[in-house]
């Protein structure tokens, strides 16, 4: 009995030792990965890095003109590194050609870079952030910002009977800044009462319960921020055009010639089509599979291109240069949506 207990303790200790060694190897590989990333930085960025600090990556963040902008320090946001840093402070600096300047406190919120009103003068600026822990460990990252114009109104179509028990969710697409105070929603210019019966709110999403055709309309979300330098709230808006349609027929017909007539040394192609029964539904996905059953994408030699319009989805299989090895091969066209799955095959033959 004593011997069995000793053997068990030995194996448990060995397992813990192996796991610890494996974890150390993983951490070392992560560090090596970011060291290599540091080596690829342009000189105008790398010259400002502190050799004592670990490098934690770069981030290219999008910003909208006239709206708030925020960015996290890359190592804090990166899933490979974030677990290493818990209690820390973040210092932000703006990188210029021959100097770096500390970012003022008014442009930092909760440790993130914060610009209350992003204008063109901020575009393409580079920022260096340094994360320092209580133990004195430090890691640095580089952030660049670029202007991106948000869509004015994004259309969304919902078919009754699809996910009625979950409701229709509308996302307020404020992708450029966090730390907002609250969001108010309007339908057709009238403020929505969040009563948790017909309408509820979860973060940036409005959920419309018990969907019906009358829920169609224009939905605007107004995002309220605050800033110590501005008396009134900063307000940013996004728009959705919701169209609710009756339940549709999701059947479709798959069309494909059973033979591909080819000539050695020349290109060839064949198109597989899916025609939906309902013109309002465009939910069929088509994939080509090679003789081994693997999906064909943008491969060399043989590749497929997918297009969709007006209830008709097409996937064209292209052969850049037909060789003898293709003759006799059978390729499968698979069309499917949430409800149905269909396949047809075609064989390569010499003309």
From Swiss-Prot:
Induction (record text): Expressed in the early phase of the viral replicative cycle.
SMART domains on file: IG
Disulphide-bonded residues: 73-129, 172-221, 272-333
InterPro entries: Ig-like_dom (IPR007110), Ig-like_dom_sf (IPR036179), Ig-like_fold (IPR013783), Ig_sub (IPR003599), IL-1_rcpt_fam (IPR015621), Immunoglobulin_dom (IPR013151)
Annotated Ig-like C2-type domain residues: 65-137, 155-237
Subcellular location: Secreted
Residues that carry a glycan: 117, 182, 261, 269, 321
GO cellular component, one term: extracellular region
GO biological process: symbiont-mediated suppression of host innate immune response; symbiont-mediated suppression of host type I interferon-mediated signaling pathway
Domain Ig-like V-type as annotated: residue spans: 246-345
CDD domains: Ig
Subunit and partners: Interacts with host IFNA1.
Functional note: Counteracts the antiviral effects of host IFN-alpha/beta and key IFN-inducible proteins involved in viral RNA degradation suxh as host OAS1. Acts as a soluble IFN-alpha receptor and thus inhibits the interaction between host IFN-alpha and its receptor.
Family designation: Belongs to the interleukin-1 receptor family.
Protein name: Soluble interferon alpha/beta receptor OPG204
Naturally occurring in which organism (per UniProt): Monkeypox virus
